[in-house]
Design a protein with these regions (language model features):
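Short, surface-exposed "cap/lid" segments of acyl-processing enzymes
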Residues: 35-78
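Gly/Ala-rich beta-loop-alpha elbow adjacent to hydrolase catalytic centers
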Residues: 125-133
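A conserved short beta-strand
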Residues: 142-154
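Cap/lid segment of the alpha/beta-hydrolase catalytic domain
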Residues: 53-55, 82-96
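Active-site loop/turn elements of alpha/beta-hydrolase fold enzymes
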Residues: 48, 74, 79-84, 88-89, ...
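Alpha/beta-hydrolase active-site loop
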Residues: 94-115
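Short beta-strand immediately N-terminal to the catalytic nucleophile in serine-hydrolase-like folds
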Residues: 120-125, 150
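N-terminal cap/lid segment of alpha/beta-hydrolase-fold proteins
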Residues: 1-41
């Protein structure tokens, strides 16, 4: 692909909104951005802290969904954890500071493997998402984790 990449670049992919139910009855909303051809792998995106504005449509993950499927053949799975709102919608439930979000991560890993039949899945955590990945991404079927430990300084 020899196309210029700009901040607003959106490349062709198959975008599918979804709802997933957790073991404790929460309805999670999200979107799968898949390549038009065969998927070479996938990333499950765990977003930053929702009480500080983190969500599935955080700029880094939105750009990944807009570009990676076409550029690399990677499927990008994004979702809002419980009680989180983005332009894509709101997941039910309430933010639980990483405790009950365990069910969100487990449900999404199951969705990736059992429903989407994805292989070569990597979990990506950004800030709060890193905490979720380290604590709750225990499904042995995923490959590894890509963790972004970002913090603010004064």
């Amino acid at each position: 692909m020899s196309q210029t990449i700009r901040p607003s670049s959106v490349f062709d992919s198959v975008r599918t909104p979804f709802h997933v139910s957790t073991a404790d009855g929460i309805d999670l909303i999200g979107e799968v951005s898949a390549p038009k051809g065969e998927s070479k792998g996938a990333i499950l995106c765990l977003h930053p802290l929702p009480t500080a504005g983190g969500m599935m449509d955080s700029h880094v993950y939105k750009k990944a969904a807009n570009r990676l499927p076409a550029m690399t053949g990677i499927t990008v799975v994004r979702f809002n954890t419980r009680g989180t709102t983005s332009e894509a919608g709101t997941s039910t439930g309430e933010f639980d500071n990483g405790k009950s979000e365990k069910f969100d991560v487990e449900a999404m890993l199951s969705y990736c493997f059992d429903h989407l039949k994805l292989e070569n899945v990597w979990v990506t955590g950004w800030s709060f998402g890193t905490d979720l990945a380290l604590q709750h991404a225990k499904d042995p079927r995923h490959k590894e984790g890509i963790l972004w430990l970002l913090g603010a300084s004064k």
